[in-house]
């Protein structure tokens, strides 16, 4: 199924869900890819960047990632998933979402996956973010 592409329907049906836990961002060298495969239960995302592999992971892997990366681990973040199945070609959903969060002074890191869009917001602002999204 291709998912919803109409912006009004997407906004009406997005039903943001606050996921349990704290999440972090880090980067590791590409040579660590096989090592990462042993920790997939706590990894939400791996993205290849020119500087290395950008990793989003749960708090349970914080110590492991600290050993694998020589760089700063960023977080904690809360994860809000938009439960509507959005079409990857849909126009405007993330623009609306990030705009309403920006107006509340809430930073957001968004990841669009195959079925849903996912928002990482500062953990201490998670309830504020949910309230802002409810305005849409």
Residue spans for each PLM region:
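Structural preference for solvent-exposed beta-strand-turn elements
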Residues: 63, 110-116, 120-125, 134-135
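Predominant activation on well-ordered alpha-helical scaffold segments within soluble catalytic domains
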Residues: 95, 127-130
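Short amphipathic alpha-helical patches
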Residues: 34, 38, 121-128
